[in-house]
Amino acid sequence: MTEPTQTQPAVAADENQIIAERRDKLRALREQGVAYPNDFRPTHRAAELQAKFAESDKEALEANPFEVAVAGRMMLKRVMGKASFATVQDGSGQIQFFVTPNDVGAETYDAFKKWDLGDIVAARGVLFRTNKGELSVKCTELRLLSKALRPLPDKFHGLSDQEMRYRQRYVDLIVTPETRDTFRARTKTIASIRKFMSDAEFMEVETPMLHPIPGGAAAKPFVTHHNALDMQMFLRIAPELYLKRLIVGGFERVFEINRNFRNEGVSPRHNPEFTMMEFYAAYTDYRWLMDFTEQLIRQAAIDALGTATIQYQGRELDLAKPFHRLTITQAIQKYAPQYTDGQLSDNAYLRSELKRLGVDVTQPAFLNAGIGALQLALFEETAESQLWEPTFIIDYPVEVSPLARASDTVPGITERFELFITGREIANGFSELNDPEDQAARFKKQVEQKDAGDEEAMYFDADYIRALEYGMPPTGGCGIGIDRLVMLLTDSPTIRDVLLFPHLRRED
């Protein structure tokens, strides 16, 4: 038995003509009976068979015939007179069909020759190896289950238009193995996180997606209207305040993996709809959180990829090494050593320097900014993108951390960290502020900033203050950006690569 070289006929005809021809074939199928049958049940998947029989040679398969029923999308077809081959792809991988008129009947064979790439087909038969050693199904029954009306992209060029890959992700998944691998890794990552949290005795919960008051983060919300209650509502920007209400209620370890929505810009790192994991643990602080977060990310990499050493954009990254820890000013002086302690403590100098670096210091967020906020802005301009290796930036100023517990020893500083890897923020956590009077005062300060024009400043949440007044135990809480973590683990340069259906402008 000789196999032809695996090639795909060049598609010369106009796509509309191809679609018209396929619709004609579908009409003929309808005339024959059920065009889209749903009575075939596979017994095996391609990857399962490839793994199970990887060591079985041609003679072993002939001596022990193994019957299978397999279905999938036809990706290649080679018709050679009285013997033909088809490569069929299911959700796990690919396997080859071997088709002859003697085995499936002349009528079925003639029909098969008219089937198109992209059609969903099914076969029953026995496994064997071809002369080239490829595991194949020698078909004794062959059926067309679903007619594809649109042609797949050319095999050798694939789906080259990046926006089209995002807009028609279903096609991208069909023709691009790397895309399928990315989303399998995403699923493994989330499964690993869930197991890690469960093993640490955290309870998974679900909190509201519609909020009467947006809170838990500094962000601009999406606004909607609840018709039955006749009230303005907001898609949640963060679940934090609800999760901490649960800590008050006595659930001492909780987490949630879900969507947040922020009506802000789109960039390689930002999508208005994104997935976060937030967790809260009573009787912990931000140092415990850093240790826990480091272990969680390391384990997620091992579970998703089989190793803690990864490649990201051509550079190696070892997540098994201890993560670095720096304060904001330490990071600035490490990556921009020209700045002196005196300059970093000079409000006027920092404003002038930020302006020189292109930051608009006249925007509302900078109106009454103190040293801490200005230092943070300088850090973002000079050091953040340099944090390639995992680094916890610690001890954030109170004025930019309205929900974090203040340090007992350093005035103006909170027990807060942000984790950066490859220059991107991956996590944000802190010892929680559980003093209701301090929290109320910080909310009032946020309201003043909002009234001054800062759209991202927080609202005053009276019910959350009431919850704190019942007493919240000392608590640590952290949020991890799932999308950015998956970007890291899958070597994806943009967040759109790890979202199945990213937001795009309306199609013309």
From Swiss-Prot:
One of its GO terms (molecular function) is lysine-tRNA ligase activity. Gene3D superfamilies: Bira Bifunctional Protein, Domain 2 (3.30.930.10), Nucleic acid-binding proteins (2.40.50.140). Binds 3 Mg(2+) ions per subunit. Keywords: Aminoacyl-tRNA synthetase, ATP-binding, Cytoplasm, Ligase, Magnesium, Metal-binding, Nucleotide-binding, Protein biosynthesis. PROSITE patterns: AA_TRNA_LIGASE_II. Pfam families: tRNA-synt_2, tRNA_anti-codon. Homodimer. NCBIfam families: lysS_bact, PRK00484.1. This is Lysine--tRNA ligase. It comes from Burkholderia multivorans (strain ATCC 17616 / 249). The gene is lysS.
